[in-house]
Amino acid sequence: MQLTPLHIQGGRNLSGEIAIQPSKNAALPIIVASLLSSEPVTLHGVPRLSDVYTILELAHHIGTRHVWTGPNSLTLHTPEILNTDAPYALVSKMRASFIMMGALLARAGEATVSMPGGCAFGYRPVDQHVKAFRALGVHIVEEGGNFEARREGSLNGAFVFELLTVGGTQNAILASVLGDGVVTLENASIDTDVVDLINFLNSLGAQIQGGGTNTLTIRGVRALRGGEYRIIPDRIEAGTFMIAAAATRSRLTLTNVRPDHLRAVSSKLMEMGVDILETEGRLIVDARDRELKPVNVTTQSFPGFPTDVQPQMSALLATVPGTSVVQDPVYPDRLTHVAELHRMGANITVSGYTQVIQGGTLHAAPVKAADLRAGAALFIAALTTEGETVIEGVQYLNRGYERLAERLRSIGANAWQPQPVLASAMD
């Protein structure tokens, strides 16, 4: 069944409250990490997104049984490993699936994993994953588009990441948790999703010290127990709706948020002239009657401005009179939103990973998302325009935003996605 496009009749102010969904980027590695235990694990706050279903399909292939026990609660049980390969058909859909290698190395001692996929914006290598594994005693070779890895004993030693990498840090952690070795990781990522993974593993009996710092020490344990865990809220979705409120010059309350995870986004919006009030688990974003100012933005690893919010910020700045400069050295090719925003009247000039944005008024147009966050930029732009924008490529939005049209309507937007019409059988 082909997905129908998202329609947005723009020009409305947003209002009310929106509950931010659990973090997809935290949920995916935690689902993978659950197979390190042979006992049942129950996760609360699991978003029902296409990427989650993909990782569950991969986990099922490995040997995990799962059951949804509530709207966002999931129980997983992996009593034994049935397969030690991660097939291309699944891994090619999503980059996060590459961390299955670390989990399989820990639990089964070997793994064959295809090169990862995901959103198609540039080359995002896994060389830091591979270098870390080799430094810690894993034998790993690449052959025919697959990485084949095995370990003879427990991982031991130290590794210094050459650059901050969320997935590389997570993969090395997963591979090191079981056994009797001691592993030290330097220049490790302090991203919120890494910290949530560490907290989850420690809740099952892992011994990982240094979460939230750039130095991690992992002492292997014989086995992990089962347990329950609640996943953190999605700071990228929260940032998206904060920017949507600013773009529509609205007042919006976000619930189920961690304000401390959003300081970089909050800081830039306040620099533009948006009022932001933080309370426990809530953020109030107020851009009503504001003459917003242009700003310069450069993406960085957490706690800096997130690359996953760069396209959305670019869409906002395209509506703000004056010159803004947006630079994304984290993922320099994350620019697929630019051509589509041009179709809506945006004035954006690109040089390398730098966008120079001359803000103005956007107009409705048919557009197509080529990746998840480009899709978010397009729906934000559509909310600001007079007229109806039709957004193709909804499958990408479904990777990161649950029930998007319904939730946009709940805060005052005129958004809908027509039901697909099934052709009748021919005689």
From Swiss-Prot:
Keyword Metal-binding found: no
Catalytic reaction list: phosphoenolpyruvate + UDP-N-acetyl-alpha-D-glucosamine = UDP-N-acetyl-3-O-(1-carboxyvinyl)-alpha-D-glucosamine + phosphate
One annotated GO biological process: peptidoglycan biosynthetic process
Main location: cytoplasm
Keyword tRNA processing: no
Pathway the protein acts in: Cell wall biogenesis; peptidoglycan biosynthesis
InterPro entries cross-referenced by the UniProt entry: Enolpyruvate_Tfrase_dom, Enolpyruvate_Tfrase_sf, MurA_subfamily, RNA3'P_cycl/enolpyr_Trfase_a/b, UDP_GlcNAc_COvinyl_MurA
Residues at which phosphoenolpyruvate binds: K24, N25
CDD domains: UdpNAET
Keywords attached to this entry: Cell cycle, Cell division, Cell shape, Cell wall biogenesis/degradation, Cytoplasm, Peptidoglycan synthesis, Pyruvate, Transferase
Any single GO CC term annotated in Swiss-Prot or TrEMBL for this entry: cytoplasm
MF terms (GO), sorted A to Z: UDP-N-acetylglucosamine 1-carboxyvinyltransferase activity
Function field: Cell wall formation. Adds enolpyruvyl to UDP-N-acetylglucosamine.
Protein known as: UDP-N-acetylglucosamine 1-carboxyvinyltransferase
Taxonomic placement: Bacteria, Thermotogati, Deinococcota, Deinococci, Deinococcales
